[in-house]
Amino acid sequence: MAYKPQFYPSATKVAENRRNHINPAFELEKLREIPDEDVVKIMGHRQPSEDYKTVHPPLEEMDLAEDYVRDLVGPINGAKEGHRIRYIQFADSMYFAPSQPYDRSRLYMSRFRGVDCGTLSGRQVVELRESNLEDISKNYLVDTELFDPATTGMRGATVHGHSLRLDENGVMFDALQRYEFDEATGHILYVKDQVGRPWDEPVDVGEPVPQEKLKEITTIYRKDGVAMRDDMEVVEVVKRIHRARTLGGYCPLNEIFDTYL
């Protein structure tokens, strides 16, 4: 019988959202359509019309030694072409942002190949071959329900703000002021790239997701939303993992489980 992964325990809405994010078969809701060149502009690694820089020749032109594993696992397109590794980094407000750092790393590694994730309390960076990174950034990380222009920020440096109160327009604080709320349209406009370099023309990433919808799609446990202490199945799983790690060093010995768990 084929193994069917559970992805995440519990039946609460937050747990369901986390489960959906990690499940590669689940189709994320598309909320906006940001042009490719605008996403490239925000990332700031190359000009929209510029060719991809490479760090090695295309694989088919290289004289590589025989490798059984390489024959089993085909390269992603960026690796085939020798494209360099680049990154995108997100900060997610603790005030009901759709995603958060651990959720991002789980879903990236579950849905995409060739990713390298860095997970901190208030930021999450993912590295990938540049062409593949642009593809997932546009089609998954910005256009879908994973992104809210007000509570999610593309920030390659100086990411502070995830734990601060939202401003009067519901927008997360950004020390580098990479984006601003346009009162005339109600949209969020990026005026700098992810590391804070300013532009002459802004990039419109659309209107903020309504608060009611954020509470429906968030993966963050909050006392004024779905409190984690009330989600007993998740609490028990987390306690079990923590005890196994602390007492057994992740070594699944029966005496550890029988005695302490």
Swiss-Prot record:
Q: Which GO terms describe its biological process?
A: methanogenesis
**Domain of life, source organism:** Archaea
What reactions does this protein catalyze? coenzyme B + methyl-coenzyme M = methane + coenzyme M-coenzyme B heterodisulfide
State where coenzyme M binds.
Answer: R123
> How is this protein annotated for GO cellular component?
cytoplasm
Enumerate the cofactors the protein uses: coenzyme F430
What's the short name of a Pfam family annotated to this entry? MCR_gamma
The question of whether Iron is a record keyword is answered with no
Question: Subunit notes for this chain?
Answer: MCR is a hexamer of two alpha, two beta, and two gamma chains, forming a dimer of heterotrimers.
Coiled-coil annotation reads: none
Keyword list (alphabetical) reads: Cytoplasm, Methanogenesis, Transferase
Q: Which Gene3D superfamilies match?
A: Methyl-coenzyme M reductase, gamma subunit
Q: Which enzyme class, named as a word? A: transferase
- The gene is mcrG
Pathway per its UniProt entry is:
One-carbon metabolism; methyl-coenzyme M reduction; methane from methyl-coenzyme M: step 1/1
Q: Where is the signal peptide?
A: none
Question: Acyltransferase: present as a keyword of the record?
Answer: no
Origin organism lineage:
Archaea, Methanobacteriati, Methanobacteriota, Methanomada group, Methanococci
Q: Where does the record say this protein resides?
A: Cytoplasm
Q: Which molecular function terms from Gene Ontology are attached?
A: coenzyme-B sulfoethylthiotransferase activity
EC numbers listed for it are 2.8.4.1
Q: What is this protein called?
A: Methyl-coenzyme M reductase subunit gamma
Quote the cofactor binding remark.
Answer: Binds 2 coenzyme F430 non-covalently per MCR complex. Coenzyme F430 is a yellow nickel porphinoid. Methyl-coenzyme-M reductase is activated when the enzyme-bound coenzyme F430 is reduced to the Ni(I) oxidation state.
According to its UniProt record, which protein family does this protein belong to?
Answer: Belongs to the methyl-coenzyme M reductase gamma subunit family.
Function, in words: Component of the methyl-coenzyme M reductase (MCR) I that catalyzes the reductive cleavage of methyl-coenzyme M (CoM-S-CH3 or 2-(methylthio)ethanesulfonate) using coenzyme B (CoB or 7-mercaptoheptanoylthreonine phosphate) as reductant which results in the production of methane and the mixed heterodisulfide of CoB and CoM (CoM-S-S-CoB). This is the final step in methanogenesis.
